[in-house]
């Protein structure tokens, strides 16, 4: 079983289930709208035009200005899928971003990115993926419109070309 192409579809299925809970709750829908539709709009907007955003660094409290991209959002959404309690913040973060307020989204994306960069799990993950699943890391048209799109598969396939096998 090659797992290379399951990331995008699985994330979209999990998001659909999670965000449908908000859409089906009158109180959540009244406050947050349709988080799935808003997420798609935010991603499309950021793919076309990444936006400079000033946010507060969660570790230092320092204000930093960087450009937020669709990849920041997709990466954050992907990791929140593994943390359902924290994932409850997604509708609020998506709502803010849909209104052009990206600071909280960027702060959390950068915090998550920093945590991942400091962990050893990426090396272990790539060792397994590159040994067992590299052949299944192919771009698929049906993943193009998902939250992750094909960027993750392209990135992992590229890393696997140089990754030691064994």
Language-model features and meaning:
Residues 2-41, 95-102, 107-116:
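A catalytic-pocket lid/entrance helix-loop region that shapes and gates access to the active site
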Residues 38-166:
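Alpha/beta-hydrolase fold active-site neighborhood
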